[in-house]
Amino acid sequence: APRGPVCDCHNLDILSKIIEQAKLLAEKHKAYMLKIDPMISYDDIESINNLKRLGFKYNADIPEDNTIQCQRNYILDIKNKTEDEIFSSFHSKWRYNIRLAVRKGVSCKYYGVEKLDDFCELMQATGKRDGFAIRSKEYFEKFLSAFEENARLYMCYSPDGEAISGALTVRYGNRVSYVYGASSDTQRNLMPNYLMQWNMIKWAIESQCDIYDFMGIPHCDEENHSNYGVYRFKKGFNGEIVKYAGEFDYIFSNVKHTVISFLLHSIGYTKL
């Protein structure tokens, strides 16, 4: 799961056991802090208070650029709905773009590790274009290996065989989540990203999931922000915004935390 720990945060006993095991790992690896980002709502006061009671520091309302993940996700409720019902709910322009990609001959399928080189090239281009660090090929190999049939690498190719879009998605519990995405700087007029999302949504439907999770929507309330386009794209699939509680820190060593925080801030690194 993209967020964790994966447990019932209403259960204080379970949370206590997680902390005790985390302390053992922290001692073994000389860790100074545990950061968690559980899948609990921002208004789940009971869970938030349980974590605070156990000693977690709640990082409420910190700037969005300073968090590891977005606090808000965009999700699509697909429970007990057919493909036709879901497709017809999309914005008309989004339906048009999906059909356009098909008409233009875009191929969208899921693959194994044999297409990771193509995906990593797209990630390089996307990271350079949008200004974010990217994972290594080895990381993505481990991702696919760890989740086995519950992870899929989707790739879109143009009619001339060029890789133009790719995504890694994972199925767990009652949902499918779009975890990593990348696209080419060329042939964007073929609208591959729309078709790729539709194929991943169809996998969620086939898997009888309740939710398709588009994941983060950074700065979704700031229309003039450079990241607002992420929300605009996902919004066309007619889902809804969910807001999570955010990050909590458990400090194992106050001295180490103070020193390391100071050093990281001094070099301009803010995601602590």
Predicted regions located by residue number:
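Short, flexible/disordered intra-domain loops and linkers
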Residues: 12-13, 41, 45-46, 219-226
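Membrane-proximal basic amphipathic "stem/tether" segments
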Residues: 251-272
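A short, internal acetyl-CoA/4′-phosphopantetheine-binding micro-motif in the GNAT/acyltransferase core
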Residues: 2-12, 79-81, 181-190, 218
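Flexible, glycine- and charge-enriched loops at secondary-structure boundaries
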Residues: 8-15, 87, 133, 190, ...
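Divalent metal-dependent hydrolysis catalytic cores, especially in the metallo-beta-lactamase
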Residues: 30-39
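Aromatic (often tryptophan-rich) hydrophobic motifs at membrane interfaces
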Residues: 17-27, 141-146, 150-253, 258
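A conserved beta-strand-loop-helix scaffold within acyl/acetyltransferase catalytic domains
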Residues: 24, 38-189
